[in-house]
UniProtKB/Swiss-Prot annotation:
UniProt KW Ion transport keyword: no
UniProt gene name: ispDF
Lineage per the UniProt record: Bacteria, Pseudomonadati, Pseudomonadota, Alphaproteobacteria, Rhodobacterales
Domain of life (superkingdom): Bacteria
Binding residues for 4-CDP-2-C-methyl-D-erythritol 2-phosphate: D228, V229, H230, H254, S255, D276, I277, G278, T352, T353, S354, E355, F359, R362
EC number(s) stated in the UniProt entry for this protein: 2.7.7.60, 4.6.1.12
Protein name as catalogued: Bifunctional enzyme IspD/IspF
Pathway where this protein functions: Isoprenoid biosynthesis; isopentenyl diphosphate biosynthesis via DXP pathway; isopentenyl diphosphate from 1-deoxy-D-xylulose 5-phosphate: step 2/6; Isoprenoid biosynthesis; isopentenyl diphosphate biosynthesis via DXP pathway; isopentenyl diphosphate from 1-deoxy-D-xylulose 5-phosphate: step 4/6
Any Pfam family hit: IspD
Site (Positions MEP for the nucleophilic attack): R148, K201
Region (2-C-methyl-D-erythritol 2,4-cyclodiphosphate synthase): 222-377
2-C-methyl-D-erythritol 4-phosphate cytidylyltransferase, as annotated region: 1-221
Record's keyword terms, sorted: Isoprene biosynthesis, Lyase, Metal-binding, Multifunctional enzyme, Nucleotidyltransferase, Transferase
UniProt GO molecular function: 2-C-methyl-D-erythritol 2,4-cyclodiphosphate synthase activity; 2-C-methyl-D-erythritol 4-phosphate cytidylyltransferase activity; metal ion binding
Organism annotation: Ruegeria pomeroyi (strain ATCC 700808 / DSM 15171 / DSS-3)
Length: 377
């Protein structure tokens, strides 16, 4: 079976305050949307659709370089979901999860329970049994009570067999509160799986503090360091952090000798306790002769994600007298961010000298140091 997830991120989120839609606000060092997307970086999920508001131009540009499938938001939530479903047409999807971007604390256990329930039912969703007394009210006064037995607070992801929910949305007149209501209108059976009190939906400003507490209590943070050095040799340019920089000499190495990218790659491997580039790409193997270092970095990033981690930020320092790094630093930052699928503000590239001491001070080569921070929610 082929499973997809649709992350609905086209809302404006005005009740949460902050001046920007809540999915783009910071939360525990990252954006809400970043946390939510990472929750669905699971082996069982082969495709992820991110539904974006048409006016979120920066987000469209940022995610266009990632493996995500992008879809435009509709005039309401149902329209956004339909656009997300349409983006999966022809991909052979059998199961689909539909999730609100404003639920960044959803657990892998909840996602797995929904997927498992779809083996026996055309629909499944997490729900929390209502335990509080329920009132009705008007003008600040209690006007009555309601029986709470059999009542559940709905959560996401709400999962469905793909063809069934596509047909249900096509037939629905609109105005549904969620996708379970759409499914029920089409007479689909929807199983209730246990919800999670921590799977809150960020709606109001105070919800950010609670979500941050939840994320930080289980967060696994790893740090890795990388160091590399290459000597100068004949040439007319060097490649640093993926950017070709004119110089009167080149750097010598088995691959393209990108000392900065090598240090960052080793920092990622180090955080995972996976050795260094040489373990994964032995210099004794001729197939890596002259290879682009992007290959190594992508491998490290893929390994990070396969282990359930996300790259929080990267810091790389280049040590050399020449060439001058400053004029190229922003371009290097953007290129590294592109390769790793990060926003540029999470990648730092800077330079220093050794005050003319040592081999870098004698302009015999370039050294690079890097630190990588990984997080697992």
């Amino acid at each position: 079976m082929t499973t997809a997830a649709i992350i609905v991120a086209a809302g404006r989120g005005t009740r949460a305050g902050g001046g920007v839609p809540k999915q783009w606000r910071p939360l525990a060092g990252r954006r809400v949307a970043d946390w939510t997307l990472d929750r669905f970086a699971l082996r069982q999920i082969t495709h992820v659709v991110l539904v974006l508001h048409p006016e979120d131009h920066d987000a469209w540009d940022e995610f266009a370089t990632t493996p995500l499938i992008l879809a435009p938001g509709g005039s309401d939530r149902a329209g956004s979901v339909r656009n997300g479903l349409a983006a999966l047409d022809g991909l052979g999807i059998t199961k689909v999860l539909i999730h609100d971007v404003a639920r960044p604390c959803v657990s892998a256990a909840t996602i797995g329970a929904v997927l498992d329930a779809l083996d026996a039912h055309p629909g499944a969703a997490p729900g929390l049994a209502v335990t509080d007394a329920l009132w009705t009210g008007a003008e600040g006064l209690v006007t009555g009570t309601r029986e709470r037995d059999g009542l559940f607070a709905a959560q996401t992801p709400q999962g469905f067999r793909y063809d069934a929910i596509v047909a249900a949305h096509a037939a629905h007149p609109g105005g549904a509160a969620d996708d379970v209501e759409v499914a029920r209108a089409a007479e689909l059976t929807v199983a209730i799986v246990p919800g999670d009190p921590d799977n809150l939906k960020i709606t109001r400003a105070e919800d950010f503090a609670r979500a941050e507490r939840i994320l930080r209590q289980d967060m696994d943070v790893r740090l890795g360091n990388g160091y590399d050095v290459h000597r100068f040799g004949p040439g007319d340019h060097v490649i640093l952090c993926g950017i070709k920089v004119p110089h009167d000499r080149g750097l010598q190495g088995h691959s393209d000798a990108d000392v900065g990218m090598h240090a960052v790659t080793d920092a990622l491997y180090g955080a995972l306790v996976e050795g260094d580039i040489g373990r994964h790409f032995p210099p004794s193997d001729p197939q890596w002769k002259g290879a682009a270092s992007e290959i190594f970095l992508r491998h490290a990033v893929d390994l990070v994600r396969a282990r359930g981690f996300a790259v929080s930020n990267i810091d790389c320092t280049l040590v050399c007298e020449y060439p001058k790094i400053g004029p190229h630093a922003l371009e290097m930052q953007a290129e590294m961010a592109r390769i790793m699928g990060l926003e540029a503000s999470r990648v730092s590239v800077k330079a220093t000298t050794s005050e003319r001491l040592g081999f870098t001070g004698r302009s015999e080569g370039i050294a690079a140091l890097a630190t990588a921070c990984l997080v697992k929610p």
